[in-house]
Amino acid sequence: MNTSWNDILETEKEKPYYQEMMTYINEARSQGKKIFPKEEDVFTAFSLTPFNNVTVVILGQDPYHGEGQAHGLSFSVLPGVKIPPSLRNMYKELAEDIEGFIPPTHGYLESWAEQGVLLLNTVLTVEESQAHSHAKLGWETFTDSIIEQLNEKKEGIIFLLWGAHAQKKGINIDAMKHSILVAPHPSPLSARRGFFGCQHFSKTNELLREKNLSEINWSSITLD
C-alpha cells in the first residue's frame, strides 16, 4: 500500500482536537502574537521527507522560540541564524563519529530531510520567547499518531531518541520491527552524560547498510 502523509494528515485534521487546536493558534496569530514557525512552515518535515522515504527519525521537542529560527524541522535553523547549543553539540559528536565531517557554519538541516531523515518535533508550534507555550494544545496527540503510523505501516526505521522526553514519546515503538537508539539529549545540560560518544550517526549508517538501504550522507549539510 502506498501511504502518503497527505492521507494521514487529512485524517487527523478532521478530528475535533485538531480543529480546536488550530482555532486557538489561528486566533493567536490574528491577535498579532508571533507564532513560530510561520504558518507555511509548520509541516515542512512532511513535505521534505515523504512517508515512503522515511528511514530515520530524529525526535525533537518543540520549535525554537526566537525570531527567524524555527522552520519546521527539529534541531534545524534557517541559514544566517546562529547555531543553537544543542545542534552545536550534535556537530561536535558528528565530527568525532563520522570521518571527514567538518561542522558547517550554519544550522540548516534540509539536506538530511531530503535523504529520508524525518526531523520531527513532538509539538509543532510555539509562541515567541515562550518555550513549551503550545505544549498540551493537541500537538502531542497529532505526533503520537504520526509515530503510530510509521510504527505500523513501515519496517526497519531507525529512531534516534535523545533525552527522557523523546524516549517517553517512543515508548510504543515496536523494537522487533524497528531500531531504537537512545542517548541523553545533546543540550549543554546533558550532552556530557552520554550524548558525546554515543556514535548514533555511524550506528545509523551501519543499520542502514545491514538493510541494504542508502546510508545518510551526514556531511551533505557542509555542502549547502
Swiss-Prot record:
Recorded catalytic activity of this chain's protein: Hydrolyzes single-stranded DNA or mismatched double-stranded DNA and polynucleotides, releasing free uracil
Species of the source: Aliivibrio salmonicida (strain LFI1238)
GO cellular component annotations of the record: cytoplasm
Keywords: Cytoplasm, DNA damage, DNA repair, Hydrolase
Family: Belongs to the uracil-DNA glycosylase (UDG) superfamily. UNG family.
Domain of life: Bacteria
Organismal lineage: Bacteria, Pseudomonadati, Pseudomonadota, Gammaproteobacteria, Vibrionales
First-level EC class: hydrolase
Purpose of the protein: Excises uracil residues from the DNA which can arise as a result of misincorporation of dUMP residues by DNA polymerase or due to deamination of cytosine.
EC number: 3.2.2.27
Primary localisation category: cytoplasm
Active-site feature positions: D62
Localization, UniProt: Cytoplasm
GO terms for MF: uracil DNA N-glycosylase activity
Gene encoding the protein: ung
A Gene Ontology biological process term: base-excision repair, AP site formation via deaminated base removal
CDD domains: UDG-F1-like
Protein name according to UniProt: Uracil-DNA glycosylase
